[in-house]
A protein has these predicted regions:
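Short, well-structured N-terminal submotif of metal-dependent ribonuclease cores
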Residues: 1-45, 54-65, 71, 89-95, ...
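Short secondary-structure boundary segments
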Residues: 7, 47, 118-120
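Short, catalytically relevant binding-site loops at active-site mouths
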Residues: 10, 49-52, 80-82
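Generic secondary-structure boundary/loop-capping signal
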Residues: 10-11, 120, 143
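A structural micro-motif
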Residues: 41, 71, 113, 142-144
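Residues at the C-termini of beta-strands that transition into short coil/loop
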Residues: 47, 77, 147-150
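Active-site neighborhoods of divalent-metal-dependent phosphate/nucleic-acid chemistry enzymes
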Residues: 70-131, 153
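Short, C-terminally biased terminal segments at protein or domain edges
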Residues: 140-157
Length: 157
């Protein structure tokens, strides 16, 4: 599969161990997928992801960027920005989720198979995905699957 990796994935990979049992499980599943499954896929990211990943604690930012370095960088073109604007203007995502809109737009415009995320608020959210899918179809695109690493584990096992 051709998969877009957004910022939450490297963030979970380098984060300090969570105390919350759900977050701890998500960290472990993400590590397992990254170690065992990523090699079976073509992974992509964008400059927007690199900018997000490079912010914050210097050591963690460096570790995130190191994980993302081998991934192919997709262009954030005018078409990507226009599609992201439609997501925001349509109220599908709130104005402060402009980077999340850009992640969806990048994966959609570049016709990838999936967008890998652990952002349950704005991306891995069935009701939001329904609206995103309608918009994508109206604009002549197929929305990539927006899913967690766990959803892609069966591809390899």
């Amino acid at each position: 599969m051709r998969i877009f990796v957004e910022t939450t994935i490297p963030s979970y990979l380098v984060a300090r161990p969570a105390r919350d049992v759900v977050q701890m499980a998500r960290q472990q599943i993400t590590r397992d997928w990254w170690e065992r499954c990523r090699g079976a896929h073509e992974l992509f990211t964008s400059q927007i992801v690199l900018d997000e990943a490079g912010a914050g604690d210097a050591a963690l930012a460096s570790a995130r960027l190191e994980l993302l370095a081998p991934l192919e960088l997709l262009e954030v073109s005018d078409s990507v920005l226009a599609f992201a604007r439609k997501i925001l203007d349509g109220g599908i995502l709130p104005p402060d989720a402009d980077r999340d809109a850009a992640h969806v737009a990048t994966a959609t415009i570049h016709r990838l198979d999936a967008l890998l995320s652990l952002n349950f608020r704005h991306l891995v959210n069935a009701s939001i995905q329904t609206c995103l899918r309608r918009l994508a179809l109206r604009e002549g695109y197929d929305l990539p699957a927006i899913c967690t690493p766990e959803a892609l584990m069966d591809d390899i096992q």
